[in-house]
Structure formats: structure tokens, C-alpha cells
């Protein structure tokens, strides 16, 4: 299933326009013919920003090419610029909205989206993640090799992974005899990168985590990454301890330390609001989908099982957490939201692949402790 879910589906750009961009980025048709045996005209994936195609190099390497769609940068610049101006006007006209800081949020989104347009930054993110894997001695996880000599701001040529998404139960069983161990590998790799790498993968939805044919976990699509400031770590550690013990007051006080408060925060009231949100988290369940597949040659019907992780529900829950903080007079760091959203994804994967696993108490799970090391935290 390779890169099929690395991007959200949108209307693809005609291949003639895609190959024209490839030729321009590589210096002409002669260079393209020199480097590539073929490029599949049919897109593997298409999103608002980029389109992905299978290809094979003259060396025999199977690759994918990620091409920025024409006109995307100008459209995004204009739309996000207008949105920023509108948010500033809204804050001026309604000062009570200043606590939410719409303009700051829009500015962060604008920066992140424009960063995604420059594939050189994504290539750099992949390189740094690969270096982290080497330093940490992690052999069971991998990121795709980037072909730098063939890549540019608008073109990214990467190793092609063959595997299945982390939510494809039947597919995982074909590549791994122990899905729970595979999940732990993915979780450990990601959580260690939060502390030990220069940045962490900030978009770990199932399409970006693959179980490869050799059983390794493949991380793809590094367009969005996050970084946690050192001064936030102590608060995160207390937040984790509060979560483990269902101590909502400790969770509330740690969030107060982490965020910028308008004034005195009522810890007890804040803790009550957090408890309501945590009850919603406990009620969220991943849905199992079973589908029939007909073999065209034999006519035999087989059934496959996968998990449907409601990304919209995860986003809504994250917004509820941020909203509760803001209603209690807090502005949480942007990185906190990015981190929590990834943790919510892993919570869903755990409920499906390893329902008996408690990541916060299981000694097989490695958690960052905030001082540059990783170990068991308050278990």
C-alpha cells in the first residue's frame, strides 16, 4: 500500500503538468530520461499541496516522486494572508477574543503550511530523523532515503516503501507475528524522538505509519514536525503523572505552569473541566471495518479487517482540551497541541492493536523524562 494514504485525496493534476515540473526542476527532458527508467503517469496520491507518483530509477531503485502542484504557493499566500488580517480585525473589534489569540494561531498555521511547500525542509527533517534513529540504536524503524541530487524545493524523490498502514490488522499480521510489539516499536520510536531528536513527527495518522514487509515500522511524510521547548518538559512530566493517577488537580496545575495565564486560575474549577474532557476520551472507541474482497481470477471472496480512526473526533477532542484551558484563562503553547494530538492517535492505535497494553505503566514502553534521557516515568 506504500504511500497511498500519506496525503488526503483531492483532484489530481494532469500528468502533463506534473512531468513539466519534474523536467524544469531537473534541468530538462534529457536529465529526466537519464535518471528515470519510468514515471507512472497515474498518481499514487493527490493532496491540495502535492501529488505523488511511483517511479523507477536507472539504478533499479523503486522510488516515489512528490511534486508540488502548480500555483499552490500563490494561492496559499493570498488565502492565509487574508485570514491573518481578518483575525487581527476580529480581535480589534472584539477585544474579549484576544485571550484566544486567533491571529497568533493563524500565524502559526501560515508558517507551518508555507514550510510544507518547501520540500527541502521536509528532506532535512527526514535526514535529522534518520540521524536520530542511528544515535538511538533503533533498527526496527526507518524513514525513506531521500535522493538529494534529484530533489529541490518543488520536487522530492524518495525511497518507495512497501507496507500497510498501522490500522490494517490483516496486513500487519502478514508482516508481523506480534502486532503489539510492532505498535510498541512505533510508540517508542516516536516518543524517544520527541526528546532526543531535533524535531518530532507531528502528523502520525495511520497513513504516515507503515508496517513494512520486513516487519519494520516506516515513518513517512515529514512535512509537519514539532519541537518541545526545554522549559515545558517539567510541566509535561507532571501532566503525565496526573493522567496516570487520574489526579485532575495535578493535571490542571501542570497546565497552568505550562501556559500563559491572564490572571489567577481557579485550579479546582479547571480540574473539574479537565475531568469532563477525560471522560470523553475514555468513551472514544476505534471502529473495526470489515470489507469483502473478490479475487478476479478465482472468484474467491475474502474478508479484511482494518480500524477506522475518526480523525475528526480526535481533532474535536484536542480543541476541547485547548478550549477548556482558554476558558480558564490560559494560552497553551502551540507545541502542546501538536504533541497531544499525536498522543491521541497512539491511544487509538493501542486500543485496537493492544487493548491490554497500558503505555504509561508497561516497562516495555519508553517515555522521555525531560532531561535528555528516556526511561520509565513515575510508574
Task: Annotate each predicted stretch with a short phrase.
Residues 1-193, 198, 210-379:
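Broad phosphate/nucleotide-binding scaffolds in NTP-utilizing and phosphate-metabolizing enzymes
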Residues 199-206:
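Catalytic-loop of the protein kinase fold
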Amino acid at each position: 500500500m506504500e504511500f497511498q494514504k500519506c496525503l488526503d485525496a483531492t483532484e489530481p493534476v494532469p500528468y502533463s503538468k506534473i512531468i513539466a515540473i519534474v523536467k524544469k526542476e531537473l534541468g530538462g527532458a534529457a536529465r529526466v530520461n537519464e535518471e528515470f527508467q519510468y514515471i507512472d503517469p497515474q498518481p499514487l496520491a493527490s493532496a491540495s499541496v502535492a501529488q505523488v507518483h511511483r517511479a523507477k530509477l536507472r539504478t533499479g531503485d523503486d522510488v516515489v516522486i512528490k511534486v508540488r502542484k502548480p500555483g499552490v504557493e500563490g494561492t496559499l499566500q493570498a488565502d492565509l494572508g487574508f485570514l491573518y488580517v481578518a483575525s487581527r480585525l476580529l480581535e480589534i473589534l472584539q477585544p474579549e477574543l484576544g485571550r484566544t489569540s486567533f491571529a497568533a494561531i493563524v500565524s502559526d498555521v501560515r508558517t507551518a503550511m508555507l514550510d510544507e511547500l518547501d520540500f527541502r525542509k521536509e528532506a532535512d527533517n527526514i535526514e535529522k530523523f534518520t540521524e536520530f534513529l542511528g544515535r538511538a540504536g533503533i533498527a526496527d524503524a526507518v524513514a525513506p532515503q531521500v535522493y538529494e541530487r534529484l530533489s529541490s524545493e518543488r520536487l522530492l524523490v524518495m525511497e518507495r516503501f512497501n507496507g500497510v498502514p498501522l490500522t490494517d490488522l490483516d496486513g500487519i499480521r502478514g508482516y508481523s507475528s506480534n502486532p503489539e510489539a510492532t505498535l510498541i516499536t512505533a510508540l517508542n520510536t516516536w516518543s524517544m524522538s520527541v526528546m532526543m531528536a531535533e524535531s518530532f513527527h507531528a502528523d502520525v495518522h495511520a497513513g504516515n505509519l507503515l508496517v513494512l514487509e520486513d516487519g519494520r515500522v516506516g515513518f513517512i511524510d515529514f512535512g509537519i514536525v514539532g519541537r518541545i521547548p526545554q522549559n515545558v518538559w517539567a510541566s509535561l512530566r507532571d501532566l503525565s503523572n496526573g493522567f496516570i493517577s487520574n489526579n485532575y488537580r495535578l493535571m490542571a496545575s501542570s497546565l497552568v505552569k505550562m501556559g500563559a495565564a491572564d490572571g489567577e486560575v481557579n485550579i479546582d474549577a479547571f480540574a473539574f473541566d479537565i475531568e469532563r474532557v477525560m471522560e470523553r476520551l475514555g468513551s472514544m472507541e476505534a471502529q473495526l471495518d470489515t470489507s469483502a474482497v473478490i479475487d478476479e481470477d478465482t472468484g474467491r471472496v475474502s474478508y479484511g479487517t482494518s480500524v477506522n480512526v475518526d480523525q475528526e473526533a480526535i481533532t474535536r477532542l484536542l480543541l476541547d482540551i485547548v478550549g477548556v484551558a482558554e476558558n480558564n484563562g490560559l494560552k497553551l503553547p502551540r507545541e502542546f497541541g501538536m504533541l497531544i494530538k499525536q498522543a491521541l492517535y497512539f491511544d487509538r492505535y493501542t486500543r485496537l492493536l493492544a487493548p491490554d497494553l497500558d503505555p504509561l505503566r508497561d516497562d516495555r514502553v519508553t517515555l522521555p523524562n525531560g532531561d535528555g534521557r528516556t526511561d520509565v516515568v513515575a510508574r
